[in-house]
């Protein structure tokens, strides 16, 4: 019996343990399943969250782009609207300015009309007063009045007669002047070669070029530094070229190089030595050139320093014309014209020879060559009438004597002589174009032509709007503007042409 009880209790205990084990297993599995479900749910929640964030960012980006596009469109519309407003304001401003101009013109017309009305009223009053006065005049008073009116009426005819007589006298004077100038030119016919800005030096062989250049170019650098002249060595056989706008420096450099080539020893110290010798030779040549110039011009008794300065003019040019030859030419021409007119030929030659003496040192001193020349002449004992010739040949002073006028005329004649002076083609063309532009800038000018190598400008005007008096004034105004705005050698002639053509046909 007890055994059955124990067996039953044991069976119950075993059954309880088995049931408890099974329950624990189910609980553990349920927990694991619950954890798995939680982890899966969290994972899905994270993925949904990330997706939502990405979609949100994309939506924000899309909205931002749409906003930027809309903002740009609005700004463009606003800019276009502002431009339309500005254009409208400019249009209104122009209209306002035009309106003000029209109002100003109307005011001027109104003022002119009122002025005319006042003049008419004054004339009416004068006529009324004149009629009242005439009613009580004597015969003699009426006669005087008629004569006064006749004088006023024919005053224009008298002025025209005066003009014709003046033109006739000027024509006779011009003919006589041309005879004197032609006589002087016939007596003086110089041979002249245009000056250039380069000199050539012949070499015994092309090997000498390397010696002139020197090691690493030291000889040529020293030569150019000392002389101030460009030494050009090219492929031309047995020749080198010296280039410089200053003829004096170029001549000293030429003699220096010839001495170096003849000696054969070329190095910096030798270059300096030969340069000093060349300077001494040129100084001697300058003195001889001055003495020869005084002899050719027939001028005696000049101060030695003036003779030396004259020699320096041999190495100066003006528009390609040698200044010393030009001075001799002016002296002879002035002397010939003075002799023809019965004036002092010696004084004219002296003034003509010294008229450009200032150009010998105008690169070293401040001032115009005429002012410098007058100061030099005064310093070395020349008389005041000679000094006046120097100052007056370019108009800085009024000429005091007839000989001073002849010196100025001879200077212009020498400069204007064909072939005496030259310019480069480019400067020549620019000067002619500028000359025609100046003439065409005046009112009533139809055409303008520069002729005679730019020494004459012919201006064709509108005949219906320009009378003889206005034509003379126009020629004067054009000549003054040319003097102010244009540089040119010699004298430039301005001719105003007024041509009126009337055509009729006989049938």
From Swiss-Prot:
- Which Enzyme Commission numbers does its entry carry? 3.1.-.-
Annotated compartments: Cell membrane
Source superkingdom? Bacteria
Entry's InterPro entries?
A: HD/PDEase_dom, HD_domain, HDIG_dom, KH_dom, KH_dom_type_1, KH_dom_type_1_sf, Ribonuclease_Y, RNase_Y_N
UniProt entry tagged with the keyword Transmembrane: yes
> Is Nuclease there in the keyword field?
yes
Enzyme class of the recorded protein, top EC level: hydrolase
The record's GO CC annotations read: plasma membrane
Ranges for domain HD: 323-416
As for family, the record states: Belongs to the RNase Y family.
By what name is this protein known?
Ribonuclease Y
Q: Tell me which species this is from.
A: Thermotoga petrophila (strain ATCC BAA-488 / DSM 13995 / JCM 10881 / RKU-1)
